[in-house]
Regions:
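Cleavable N-terminal signal peptides of Sec/SRP-targeted secreted and luminal proteins
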Residues: 2-19
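Substrate-binding surface in catalytic domains of secreted glycosidases
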Residues: 105, 125-278
Length: 362
């Protein structure tokens, strides 16, 4: 019996024993991905079929935040990329050990039944340092990682963290313990205006100095750089201006958030595909803020109100992702992969390709 025949027979036998029919054209595509890549490109997918237009030559992990798509799983596996579950749970519930174990067991079984390769834990709740939830969260990550690694060898467990470990949005987590337990931290380097302590004005979603300094804060906690994935935004914020000055200062509504008087909740998130269409017909065209190292533009809505849109594009993104290799981080990712324009329009296709390329620096 040849080794290849034996491995194929064994794979089929495992699937039969498991009892879950493989939805892929080839049964080997239902086998979990175990290979590690030197550089991680971590994509959040929120549903639909735009994943068919991703740059699969670079994608290593897809975190599925939409409805389960067996076709996506099969395709990702054919490209050697992982597909991982979303994990979210109310922290007060998993303070109880039995509840925590039950949740983990449910997620492991779900991942197995869907032939998936791990889990991305996305818990963005406020936590007080030293509280029962504080310790329960660290335990959850540790126990989830242990269970997945045991039940699905080679699986990946990741945890999403705020752009800085400095109590952002009152998320006081045990970052050191969490980083030690899981395979990687996805640093969400966006929504950095969720708490605006000073003037209520429109600003960049991810200003460069603030963004990069925050990685030094994580590294100063002795978290290994190989545990950190830089997440960049493929979206921006559209702010209605209550007052607009000749110096392009846009005053925004006071929308408090978790103790701060103002926040980016005064604006609306807009996809990069929308932004590229809007900027071409805007009042100002693309402008550049040299301090925040970010693009923005101004436009007038049908009611005559001026809006200011802050966003990231290939120029601002690559300035940040240059830092990834300079510091030896694990890789890059984005929120989210679906919101580029993947249509047949040649201009849109070029814009989308440039966004993918920017993940690797300037």
């Amino acid at each position: 019996m040849s080794p290849s025949f034996f491995l194929g027979f064994l794979s089929s036998l495992i699937l039969v024993i498991r009892g879950d029919p493989c939805p892929c054209e080839r049964e080997e595509l239902c086998q979990q991905i175990r290979d590690e890549r030197d550089f991680e490109v971590f994509v959040f997918d929120v549903g639909g079929k735009t994943w068919k237009s991703y740059n699969w030559s670079v994608v290593t992990t897809v975190a599925t935040f939409g409805k389960y798509d067996a076709e996506l799983m099969c395709h990702a596996h054919s490209k050697g990329a992982r597909v991982v579950l979303k994990g979210d749970i109310r922290l007060a519930y998993i303070v109880d050990q039995n509840n925590r174990t039950g949740w983990i067991t449910e997620k492991v079984n779900l991942a197995k039944s869907q032939f998936m390769d791990g889990i991305n834990i996305d818990i963005e709740q406020a936590v007080e340092e030293g509280s029962s939830e504080y310790f329960a969260l660290a335990d959850l990550v540790k126990e989830t990682t242990e269970a997945f690694h045991k039940e699905i060898p080679g699986s990946q467990v990741s945890f999403d963290v705020a752009w800085s470990p400095e109590r952002i949005d009152k998320r006081c987590y045990d970052y050191i313990a969490i980083a030690e337990s899981c395979d990687l931290l996805f640093v969400m380097s966006y929504d950095e205006q969720s708490q605006i302590p000073g003037d209520c004005i429109a600003m960049a979603n991810a200003p460069i100095t603030q963004t990069l300094n925050a990685y030094d804060q994580y590294l100063n906690l002795k978290i290994a750089p190989q545990k950190l994935v830089m997440g960049v935004p493929w979206y921006g914020y559209d702010y209605p201006c209550l007052n607009f000055t000749q110096n392009n200062i846009c005053s925004i509504a006071k929308v408090p958030f978790r103790g701060a008087p103002c926040s980016d909740a005064a604006g609306k998130q807009k996809a990069y595909s929308w932004i590229m269409k809007q900027v071409s017909s805007s009042l100002s065209g693309r402008l550049w803020d040299g301090v925040q190292q970010a693009p923005y533009f101004n436009y007038k809505d049908p009611e005559g109100q001026i809006h200011q849109v802050w966003y990231d594009d290939p120029e601002s993104i690559c300035l940040k992702t240059d830092f990834v290799k300079a510091k030896g981080l694990r890789g890059v990712g984005m929120w989210n992969g679906n919101i580029l324009d993947y249509s047949d329009d040649p201009v849109a296709r070029q814009q989308s390709a440039m966004m993918w390329n920017a993940l690797f620096g300037c």
